[in-house]
Each structure stands twice: as C-alpha cells, then as structure tokens.
Amino acid sequence: MPHFRRPLMAALAAALCFLAIKSAMAAPSKAEIESRFQSWISRDLWPQAKKAGISQATFTSVMKTVKLDWSLPDLAPPGFPPPKQRPQSQAEFSSPGPYFREARMQALAASGRALADQYASTLKKIEAKYGVPGPILLALWGRETGYGRAKLPYEAVDVLATSAFMSTRQELFTRELIDALHIIDGKDIAADAMLSSSAGALGQPQFMPSSFLQYAVDFDGDGHRNIWTSVPDSLASMANFLVQKGWQRGRDWGFEVTIPSGVSCAQEGPDLAKPMSAWAATGISRIGGKAFPKQDLSAATMMLVPAGTHGPEFLVTPNFYVLKEYNNSDLYALFIGNLADRIAYGSGSFSAPWGDVGHMLRSDVQSMQQTLVKKGYDVGKADGLAGFKTRRSLGDWQAKNGLKPTCFPDEGLKAKLK
C-alpha cells in the first residue's frame, strides 16, 4: 500500500528532526562549554582563590592561558550525563602475584642500585636528617615515576582546572587547583613547568598540590621546592612525607617469615600488634633462619598475610603502614619494601610463592563479605577487596566451622560460605 508510505516517512522524518533538535538543546556544544568555563573562572573560581590568598596578578597570569583538556578520563561536562562507570563488582579477583612481576622488579632494582651509588652522598644526608633509609626512597621514586624517567605530559593547571569545572569530584579538584595557584604564587615553579599526571599528581614524587604545600622541601638550597627536576628536593620531600606520617627511625619495614601451621593466620592487622619477641615465641621465624633485629624484639610488630596461607607471610613494623600512607594498599607497601631490600641487599623475590586462588569476580568476594557481616563478623568495607579485616574474619569463620584457616577468599569457599 504505497499511498501510506509517504505520510509515514514524513512522520518519521519529523520525529527524527524533533529528537535532533531536542538533543541539540540538551547537549551544549564544546564552544558553549568553553564559554561557560571562562565564566566559571571569573564568577566562581576567582572569589574562592582570592579568599584563599591568591594574588590577582598570579591568578590573571595563570588563568588567562588555561584550557580545558577534553582527553582526561571521567569528565562530566555541563549538560551531559555523568560518565558510565564499569561496575567494580565485575572486576576480576585473583592472586596478588602479577603485581610483583619479576622482570619489572629486577629492572627497577638494577636501576635503583646504580642510582644509590650516584646519589650516595645526597641519600646519606637525607637519612641523617629524616631517618628514612635511602633504599626506601629510591623504591618509592622507582615505583612512582620510574626514577623520574616517566613522562608527565600534562600541564597541571589545565588538568586541575578541567577537573574542577567538569569532573565527578569538582570540590576536591577546586581545592587542589587553588593549592596549585599557591605553589605558583610562592615562586616554587612556573605554571608552564608544573607538569603532572592526568590526575594532577606533580613531579617525581607524584604529590597532589595539597601534599606539595605540606611536605615538599628545598633540599638543594636553591630557594625553590623543585620536585620536577631536582633529585635532592624530590627524595627529601618523600622522606619528609614519610616522617610526617610517622616513620620510625632505625626500624625496617618488615620481614618475610614462616608461620607454623598451628599459629592462626587470623591474627593480622595494625590493631593486633605485639612485641616481636611474642610472635617469635609462637614459633614464627624469619626466612633463611636469620635472627630478628634486637632493637625490634620489644617493639610493636604486626602479622601480615596479604594472600592468607596462599602466599608469603610477614611480620611488619609500623613503618609498613606509613608506606601505605603513600598509597593505601598492602601490595603497594610490599612492593616498596621488597624493591628497597633488592636495592639495599641484592635480595630477590619473596621466598614463598603466590598461590592460585581460582577465578572469581569481586562480586564473589563481596558476597562472602556480606555473608560474614550477617554472621556478625567485621570485614571492614564489603567492597569485594580482601583487606586485613576480611582476611582474618574469614580465618575465624573457617576455624569456627572446623575448616583449616586460609584467611583468603578462594573458589572453594564460595559454596561453603553461605
């Protein structure tokens, strides 16, 4: 019936035209968003910057050349829906082993040992002042920016201004942007030399601007806190960060140990500290038969089993948790500790291997956590990540139910823990 086709096509065309007009009205163009950005700078940002003490000369000079960086992740431009987030519950949950890829660890250790020789005098002075061993600082430097070799392709002010205007965390980045303006106002670095990651982390230590203001130091004595091109300033700033977070002079980060089968793995965590001598009295011993340092025997020490009985086991000092202040991850702090030991002593990978826990999703672990919570256990946050509270609660539940504690989620527990 061809005579019905023309009105139908006309109606369809009209509908598509309406949708196109509606879409155009709902979603502003890039040019319009750029215009709104400029208005935001003068109307919203400047009053906040002025109140924070930023000079008008600095603000005008810096912000007149700032531009939106549309390449950044997780942007939420005005008039557009927020970016879709992949449900973290669908992320894979597996053994921590891949985090410690041996080829990478060896390469970083080799470079670290060479740099330890090159900067021996500087590192000695930093350790004398702050009490943080050089290998720890080198390990942080290597992990964060590959000893300064990683490219920082972003201008920090562009990144921070873009994120302050149209990201999902506008308030946070507005504060960081104003702190970046404080750094420029203080003449530590020029705006065009303030390079960062895509998240706005600055220089070789990867400090956010707020951390720079609090922890960066001028160690080479040139009058500027330069964490971009000055190695002494970068290393000393990291040392100052650790000290301000509680680093204890004269103590190591921790030791790989063997935990006897009769000693429960569900005793870990910073809230269950004991003198190292008390742990040793249970039969826990250092790998290789080495003695624990005498100065540590009466000092607070914690059990750490990042993969339960499926991987290496440790006794750690409070300095381990200070390393977590840099990045709140057990694996990150272990990476730094192991890399520092490789640089200092030529040691290798952990003695015990990382075991296979099967193939699971974070949603599987989250389900286990939720079940444990219903049974009265404290898992910390039920987020699908196996933190120390989840690990020890699993161990306690296993022991209570006649199972050998492993203190880590695995495929075999999915069916049992209901």
Where are these regions (language model features)?
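Bacterial N-terminal signal peptides that target proteins for export
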Residues: 1-11
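Bacterial N-terminal signal peptides
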Residues: 10-20
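An acidic, Gly/Ser/Thr/Pro-rich helix-cap/linker signature
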Residues: 27-127
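Sec-exported extracytoplasmic/periplasmic mature domains
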Residues: 42-59, 64-71, 128-131, 142-146, ...
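Acidic/His-rich structured neighborhood in mature extracellular/periplasmic domains
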Residues: 88-243, 253
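Flexible, glycine-rich surface segments
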Residues: 191, 195-325, 333
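Acidic, Ser/Thr/Pro/Gly-enriched interdomain connector segments
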Residues: 317-329, 338-385
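Short acidic, glycine/serine/threonine-rich helix-capping segments at coil-helix boundaries
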Residues: 360-365, 373-417
